[in-house]
Amino acid sequence: MTRQGNWYVGFAVLMGASITVAAHRPVTAQAPAPASGVVTFARDVLPILQKHCQSCHRPGQIGPMSLLDYSSTRPWAQSIKTKVRSREMPPWDADPAYGHFTNDRSLSRQEIDTLTAWADGGAALGNPSDAPAPITWPSGGWLVEPEVIVDLPEYQVPASGTIEWENIAIRSPFKSDTWVSSIEILPSDPSTVHHMCFEFKTPQPNIVYNQYEWAEVPRDADGAASRRQGAGDNWVLTRDAGSTEVKRRPGRPTLFPMPKHCYVPGMSLHDYRPYEAGLLVPGGADIHINLHYQTSGKPAVDRMRLGFTLAKQTPRKKLVQLVPTGTTASFAIPPNESNYAAPVVEVRIRRDAELVWMSPHMHFRGKDMTWTLTRPDGRQQVVLSVPRYRYAWQLLYQTRVPVPAGSKFTFVAHYDNSAANRDNPNPNVWVRPGNQAWEEMMVPFTWLVVDTEVNDRDVTSPYTRGDGA
């Protein structure tokens, strides 16, 4: 549970543990109040770890140590105590005054007291017969056993340098229209992955399969992207999968995958089953992928896998993703500004829906983000407030809130570019929008459930933006 220098370790227990494991982790007994005497691992601690920690803290997952059994947990007793008392672990940044979340991973006061007493009391094992049955996890690192698996090409991650966003197209295994009930994205080396997103797209002419392509991005000494002046100044770099040879050509990329289905370390499973929902994959559609790897000082190799489960019958519902953004051309954070307000974003909902998932996405300077739902009768409800955003713990918050047609979402975010922000790599520079972590984004990812017959384009009106709040 120690915080590592690289952000991805912190990112770990976040979204997947939050978004999906709540729906798929086998039910475990609630830890009882410790009986008088010594708090033990078997009776008192293990139920807490099963409920809150083991989804990520097990072999093959992103957690830096396993917490499956006593021998692997005992050396970390004092660290566990420190992290849970400070509420750094498990990560949960939602203001408890707003919203109700079905995947709330925060510990109760009783659970914190139990873990503290265990560490302070000698971290005893206790009677092994008091332990709950171990959780049976799917093989191969999956959270849900897939019925269809797609292997992506192996990716060689260099030891150093800036890796831009890369895109690649591969063929889909779905030859006829297919409803899938879950999608899981599984890297072989999560420590190298900033994100991976993909979407299904109708085959297009001139697409080269199994070839990475990315836009050449000129950068200044601070790593900020320099804007090209004319279309003739644009260049695209390409590399065949499995090759190290990079080719350069004028023009623009041919692939533009939207972030429909994404992996970030810790968020790997998109599960539609709790909502009686599914995703319709058109027969013969290609898979267009956007990848962003990060260097760590040593070369690495990753190979992504996509796992799908199939719907047994046509679902009644589907998920629609909203990707509003406040990082417009006017977005610019001054040096040493501690409370920069991004342009306020509003989204009007035109069809009856249900709010189910929310995930604030910012980079190093992100400070806070709030979702406010205004219903047609004017009633307002803060459905999510993240007052202390941490880039290392970008959580996904799962809820169920009715959203009648005519409602409006308002998204507000602030940024801290001062030296007081411990994640800030340089408070003395202007910060503008960009893909790298030292640049910025303001994206309040939001997912709604609607009836399957609803056209996705009919769910919202065009996004609007105002001045910073």
What are these regions (language model features)?
Residues 91, 96-101, 131-354, 359-468:
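Beta-strand-centric surfaces of beta-sandwich/beta-rich domains
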Residues 13-16, 46, 97, 106, ...:
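Short linear sequence elements within intrinsically disordered, low-complexity coil regions
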Residues 9-22:
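Bacterial N-terminal signal peptides
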Residues 6-7, 418:
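Long, ordered, helix-rich scaffold segments
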Residues 8, 28, 34, 199, ...:
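Alpha-helical and His/Cys-centered functional microenvironments
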Residues 21-173, 182, 186, 284-290, ...:
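Aromatic- and Gly/Pro-enriched helix-to-coil junctions and flexible linker segments
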Residues 1-5:
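N-terminal secretory signal peptides that target proteins for export/translocation
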